[in-house]
């Protein structure tokens, strides 16, 4: 159930009748190369959360579209402080609990949000019913930024993709784990310096078919995770 557009009496009745799982998608607004929209992270996590919520009959909250994206400057980004995102989630979860919903799953769609979400989790460690996950950890492939994975997913869910502008970005093929780890740390400080064009991976062979496969894999694994948690 999408909470937006619901009516108070119906919502309170549903909460009273059965324990609910609230789903909070968290994305970002930031550059995704010349071929994907700046809303890519939010678009993907919203779609995955929507499909997941239908599978478990959960309550889908509006996506938090603003994340921590300073590392993409001077390419375009709309970023908030780490403390801001953590406090916002704390307030939203507190309000949900006050209204009778204590089982809360936060689905993250942006790598740069991780530190803030980990901080939030530490503060909420006593509450086993509040869980933070990143959707890309539920697929059996290497994640990227505007590369094959994200571009394929966007082709599966959106018409707002300019494949004619897609170009290969920074790739880690042949690099050791230590080298990749070092590059990752550099990218967290300045993504444009590492990638050049804002792309991590190769989007040129992306397809909607692969995107649909990835989405199904992620959603099915999220359902399994939810069953184990709640």
Question: Model-derived features: where do they sit?
Answer:
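Extended, histidine- and acidic-residue-enriched regions that form the cofactor-binding/catalytic faces
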Residues: 1-103, 111-230
């Amino acid at each position: 159930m999408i909470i937006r557009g619901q009516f108070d009496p119906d919502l309170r009745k549903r909460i009273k009748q059965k324990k609910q799982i609230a789903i909070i998608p968290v994305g970002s607004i930031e550059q995704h190369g010349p071929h994907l929209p700046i809303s890519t992270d939010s678009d993907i996590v919203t779609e995955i959360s929507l499909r997941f919520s239908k599978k478990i009959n959960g309550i889908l909250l509006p996506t938090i579209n603003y994340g921590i994206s300073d590392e993409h400057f001077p390419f375009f980004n709309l970023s908030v402080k780490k403390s801001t995102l953590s406090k916002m989630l704390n307030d939203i979860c507190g309000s949900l609990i006050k209204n009778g919903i204590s089982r809360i799953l936060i689905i993250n769609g942006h790598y740069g949000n991780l530190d803030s979400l980990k901080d939030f989790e530490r503060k909420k460690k006593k509450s086993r019913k509040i869980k933070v996950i990143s959707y890309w950890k539920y697929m059996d492939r290497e994640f990227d930024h505007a590369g094959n994975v994200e571009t394929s997913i966007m082709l599966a869910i959106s018409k707002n993709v300019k494949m004619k502008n897609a170009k290969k970005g920074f790739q880690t093929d042949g690099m050791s784990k230590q080298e990749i780890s070092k590059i990752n740390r550099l990218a967290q400080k300045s993504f444009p310096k590492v990638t050049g064009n804002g792309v991590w991976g190769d989007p040129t062979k992306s397809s909607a078919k692969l995107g649909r496969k990835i989405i199904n894999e992620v959603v099915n694994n999220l359902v399994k995770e939810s069953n184990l948690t709640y």
